[in-house]
Structures are given as structure tokens and as C-alpha cells.
């Protein structure tokens, strides 16, 4: 009697084990292969916008413009004197 009951149980257990992973445990379904790339692009866009806003709101552009203007003025004066 024990053998009679244990064989079907063994068959059921083996069929469950050998069936493989359930669909939810399998590989994730990829609806669009470019979703990850799109997310990366949006992140890059946000970071770039934040960087540009930070630069435009800082004093760095004004300081650079003043430095270039002063350097250009000095070079111009030096060339005027030498000529």
C-alpha cells in the first residue's frame, strides 16, 4: 500500500520540480528594449539641465567675461604701444 501511494506522490513532485520556473519567476518581460536607454537619456537630460542652470546662476560666467575683457584690453594696449 505504501508503494502504491508513494509512486504517484513521487511523480507529482518530480513533475513540479522538472517543470521549471513559474512565468513570474522567469525572465522579466521586455515590452520595449529601449526603455532602459530612454530612462538613461532622461536622467542625462535632467543632469545636464541642472548643470547648465547652476552655471548660469553662478558668478563664473561674469568673472570669466571680465577676465577675458581685461586680458584683451591689456593685449590691445601692448600692441598699440609696440606699433
Swiss-Prot record:
It comes from the Eukaryota. It is found in: Secreted. InterPro entries: ApoC-1_sf, ApoC-I. One of its GO terms (cellular component) is high-density lipoprotein particle. Keywords: Lipid transport, Secreted, Signal, Transport. Residues 1-26 form the signal peptide. Apolipoprotein C-I is present in acidic (APOC1A) and basic (APOC1B) forms in P.paniscus, P.abelii and P.troglodytes and perhaps also in baboons and macaques. The two genes for ApoC-I arose through a duplication process that occurred after the divergence of New World monkeys from the human lineage. In human, the acidic form has become a pseudogene sometime between the divergence of bonobos and chimpanzees from the human lineage and the appearance of the Denisovans. Pseudogenization resulted when the codon for the penultimate amino acid in the signal sequence was changed to a stop codon. This is Apolipoprotein C-I, acidic form. It comes from Pan paniscus. The gene is APOC1A.
